C-alpha cells in the first residue's frame, strides 16, 4: 500500500491578484480576463512543485490569496 505526505502552501493575493479577482461580485467569471502573465506565474508554481515530486491536489482561491494542497508518495 502506498503512503503519502502532504503539504499546504500559502500564496498572497498580491502575487496572483488578477487570477483571484477574475470573477465579479455577482458571480460572473471570465477566464479570458486573466492576464497571460498571471497564468505563467501559476504554471511556474505548479511546475516547481512537480519537479520536487509534489502533485497538486487542490488550489483554493480567496480574497486573501491562494492555498495550494500538494501530495507526494513516500518512497
For the regions a protein language model found, what residue spans apply to each?
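Terminus-proximal functional modules
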Residues: 1-75
